[in-house]
Amino acid sequence: MTTHVTLEDALSNVDLLEELPLPDQQPCIEPPPSSIMYQANFDTNFEDRNAFVTGIARYIEQATVHSSMNEMLEEGHDYAVMLYTWRSCSRAIPQVKCNEQPNRVEIYEKTVEVLEPEVTKLMKFMYFQRKAIERFCSEVKRLCHAERRKDFVSEAYLLTLGKFINMFAVLDELKNMKCSVKNDHSAYKRAAQFLRKMADPQSIQESQNLSMFLANHNRITQCLHQQLEVIPGYEELLADIVNICVDYYENKMYLTPSEKHMLLKVMGFGLYLMDGNVSNIYKLDAKKRINLSKIDKFFKQLQVVPLFGDMQIELARYIKTSAHYEENKSKWTCTQSSISPQYNICEQMVQIRDDHIRFISELARYSNSEVVTGSGLDSQKSDEEYRELFDLALRGLQLLSKWSAHVMEVYSWKLVHPTDKFCNKDCPGTAEEYERATRYNYTSEEKFAFVEVIAMIKGLQVLMGRMESVFNQAIRNTIYAALQDFAQVTLREPLRQAVRKKKNVLISVLQAIRKTICDWEGGREPPNDPCLRGEKDPKGGFDIKVPRRAVGPSSTQLYMVRTMLESLIADKSGSKKTLRSSLDGPIVLAIEDFHKQSFFFTHLLNISEALQQCCDLSQLWFREFFLELTMGRRIQFPIEMSMPWILTDHILETKEPSMMEYVLYPLDLYNDSAYYALTKFKKQFLYDEIEAEVNLCFDQFVYKLADQIFAYYKAMAGSVLLDKRFRAECKNYGVIIPYPPSNRYETLLKQRHVQLLGRSIDLNRLITQRISAAMYKSLDQAISRFESEDLTSIVELEWLLEINRLTHRLLCKHMTLDSFDAMFREANHNVSAPYGRITLHVFWELNFDFLPNYCYNGSTNRFVRTAIPFTQEPQRDKPANVQPYYLYGSKPLNIAYSHIYSSYRNFVGPPHFKTICRLLGYQGIAVVMEELLKIVKSLLQGTILQYVKTLIEVMPKICRLPRHEYGSPGILEFFHHQLKDIIEYAELKTDVFQSLREVGNAILFCLLIEQALSQEEVCDLLHAAPFQNILPRVYIKEGERLEVRMKRLEAKYAPLHLVPLIERLGTPQQIAIAREGDLLTKERLCCGLSMFEVILTRIRSYLQDPIWRGPPPTNGVMHVDECVEFHRLWSAMQFVYCIPVGTNEFTAEQCFGDGLNWAGCSIIVLLGQQRRFDLFDFCYHLLKVQRQDGKDEIIKNVPLKKMADRIRKYQILNNEVFAILNKYMKSVETDSSTVEHVRCFQPPIHQSLATTC
């Protein structure tokens, strides 16, 4: 029976699929996320000790002591956390200002209510330290008893006592440091006394004891010292503890950084405790009981070690404060002020890199075979192969521990030795101590070294984490094999000898070891084993089959075996003769070697936890000690002083390509700190502070990274598009325009799930959002820059847009952005509006600046700004100051492009018109043309029409062309006299010419736009040709057929032919669009569409007023001598501007350019008066006569020859204008008038004949 599933359930199940993480090819440049699986903890803290009844009873009892001492150590750690993370409560509580304050009782009650739980903790802490000192001293007293002094004490037991010594040192230093603890207790005490809470004498005494305990520095140390000194021989036991620490430190018998630093602290504090009134460490050194020179060497190599959190301890301080230091000062070198090379991390980097590369190479070999090929867990390996993996795991953990310890040691040294304004010129004198210890205390090289080492640690942690299951298998197999081989095989020979020599104690220990650890093949020890009887093996040998399993020993089991083995080779045994002397030399060496190797078994059996501890750098964030030093002035330090952000920001600020892929590793320090705050400190408020800082830092990180990525690709686009010849020319002059250095942003842009504080962050999406905004801002800035400048800057605008387009294309390889056209339309405000900002500004510039202030030069085909502006400079908004990457990409590129485009600044010509065509498109051009026609209409039917009417009135009614016999001087004088009123008309050379210039510039703009548009369309057509099956005729050899070659070419380009392709594969809508597009592309040039014809036709419709054509001619044909038509007025105007000007005066060309002539000639052509103008023009008539007689006189202050030359220039210009206009107008007339209109006139009749008729 099928289960019914509703639609809602089905949809919700589908939605759940989105939450499944799918494996991708994201490069791994971040640390491993915290495992969601539980870490198995096999440490039983000796709870199963009673199960090992076969073991030596004394060591089982010792395990019981161990168990209780470990519990006390854990309790001590909890109190250390309490002290370290203590934040002052009393500062937050309102203070009672005077005894008369009405609410003082309420304040004191609240104070007691808030502080009482905290003071109770302090009271428990005081009791604990008393109990811990008593317990430690009782153990010391027991072990130092006269009858027990020669008894064997295990290394594990001595180390546990050493951990106690370390605990006392840490607790005392934390108590000394925390002033807020004392302040809170004082506040509570005041409030409690006021409220009479402590009435009984015992409470008062306990409170007084707590006050004294908190107030006295080094109280724990003093109490410990006093109680130890009364124990006879205590220094001997402490010497054993110090010696075991020296031995472990020298032989690197530690794994985690905390273990290493604990050994050093125990050495230092142990020496301090030993050196007193009863004992003298220098005498013990003389007796060779301890080795002070070796300890001095250790302390000189490592002067400062972490104490707890961000608290550090100078090891030499223990020596300096010891009782007999002054008289033995010369024996110590560690107390002298010198910097150990250990703290110069830059010098250590060569060795660290070498170790990293060597180990990674070896690990990769195993990783490829174990993890990648999947042969790890399934395949059974030999003991040697398991041993290799075991050793590899151990070496990896030791390397990680070494690097982590090195980072923490350098950090500790820096915290103890903050910089100042004399050591670092960048450090201000007002900088806080923590700021001097972190922000200004590292050079750039040191920061990079820190980042690199952290990246190595976290990167290797990832690789080893991937192989954890393989390592686990190998570790359990290897440890099992090592234990069983040793117990079942190696110990047979000493057991045989002990039985033969009847060494009962030795037999009991060896048998206890075998019974504790052996896992026999048949489930029980072979009863016929000759060694049990002290006999030799038979000649054929006694075969013992040792099984192989992936099972590790329990922590108690391992402890028992190691302790019993240690008792065999120890120098103390409780009797006159040691067990060691009963064993052969090779056996002793074998036991010592196994005992040393098995030290790391406990760590490796918990490899997951060990790996996490070896890579833990959480203390780089904690700053409770330095917060305490601010005495409440700081609640928390800003991110500029936080080490994780300092390292991250340094990579971002320097833009170092080799470090860019490491940028996520410093951020993982927040993960370490947050994990430590929750699991070790167990303080939610610390986690909240870390989370708040992460939120701020990550926002800053994404903001800075996105800006950098955008700037990088913008500079790359700007460099690619920069003219190569310009770059080469600059190089010749010694100016280098650099390409942006290659950076590794691609890896960062592939990060889809960055793990930070348990969140999975799509870094690519966040950067994409920022870059989309930056892209939009960049386009907006390009358009705003154009809007703040004149029309000449449109060429620069196009290149800015091209650079942005290339930037968009480069970025789209790594992220999903909106299409460039959509972004451009949004920035141009052209999404829903029919025209955008560019179109509006082009028209605005045409109207207010281009038409009234530019002069056209037909020779250069350019417009230039007029020498005398007749209108004010239009007011434009200034562009906003933005970063260089919002323009061309960088400062050098901005300067280079500014130089290139400065050559386009002083004119408007073909480059500008082509750019306008490309940017405005058909729709924008149509809008601009329409608006220009409105301007022309308003001028022709407004200002110009009024002036024409006025000027027609002042023209002579009749002005015949004089006969040639008058000569050119006479004709000039005649015209000058006839046109006197026109010449002297005040507004002719200003407002009239200015208005005509605007009309001419508008007409010229339309013409040049069409020419530029035609070129762009031809370019489009050529580009589209292969996709439209428009193929060029091919060259054929003699004897070849054209049809064959063409068919072959058509077959070659057939896959590119778009329309048949879409007709075969597309939807009906796509097919329709493809056909229409193909038709438009083919036909728009072929059918000879001309926009300029339409413009001229529209302008002709504006010339309907009778004043332009004058009244009908009296002769019924045309006006000959009458000055009533526009062409006669234009002749008069032409006569005026042909008159040569004085030396310091501007000519009409300089003031108005060719636009003036274009306006006049266009009106004449549109009115159909061109031929009449050519026949009856005053200037042309004067020129013809002057060419014949060649005279040069000055008539009315007008040089005749110069005037004739000017007339000739304008005649040539007029002819060019007429030719261009007629080319367009004739096609219009041909199209519109298919029937030719012919008017028939009667032939002329002579006067004599007319009278006779």
Curated annotation (Swiss-Prot):
Keyword flag Heme: no
Key words of the record: Acetylation, Apoptosis, Cell adhesion, Cytoplasm, Nucleus, Synapse, Synaptosome
Impact after mutating residue 320 to E: In RNA edited version
Entry annotated with the keyword Cytoplasm: yes
InterPro entries: CYRIA/CYRIB_Rac1-bd (IPR009828), Cytoplasmic_FMR1-int (IPR008081)
N6-acetyllysine PTM positions: 1037
Known tissue expression: Expressed in hippocampus (at protein level).
GO biological process: apoptotic process; cell-cell adhesion; dendrite extension; neuron projection development; positive regulation of neurotrophin TRK receptor signaling pathway; positive regulation of proteolysis; regulation of actin filament polymerization; regulation of postsynapse assembly
Location (main, coarse): cytoplasm
GO molecular function list: small GTPase binding
Listed GO CC annotations: cytoplasm; neuron projection; nucleus; perinuclear region of cytoplasm; SCAR complex; synapse
Compartment list: Cytoplasm; Nucleus; Cytoplasm, Perinuclear region; Synapse, Synaptosome
Domain of life (superkingdom): Eukaryota
Family: Belongs to the CYFIP family.
Assembly and interaction partners: Component of the WAVE1 complex composed of ABI2, CYFIP1 or CYFIP2, BRK1, NCKAP1 and WASF1/WAVE1. Interacts with FMR1, FXR1 and FXR2. Interacts with FMR1; the interaction occurs in a RNA-dependent manner. Interacts with RAC1 (activated form) which causes the complex to dissociate, releasing activated WASF1. The complex can also be activated by NCK1. Interacts with SHANK3; the interaction mediates the association of SHANK3 with the WAVE1 complex. Interacts with TMEM108 (via N-terminus); the interaction associates TMEM108 with the WAVE1 complex.
Family matches, as PANTHER family: CYTOPLASMIC FMR1-INTERACTING PROTEIN-RELATED (PTHR12195)
Functional summary from the UniProt entry: Part of the WAVE1 complex that regulates actin filament reorganization via its interaction with the Arp2/3 complex. Involved in T-cell adhesion and p53-dependent induction of apoptosis. Does not bind RNA. As component of the WAVE1 complex, required for BDNF-NTRK2 endocytic trafficking and signaling from early endosomes.
UniProt protein name: Cytoplasmic FMR1-interacting protein 2
Organism: Mus musculus (Mouse)
Gene from which this protein is expressed: Cyfip2
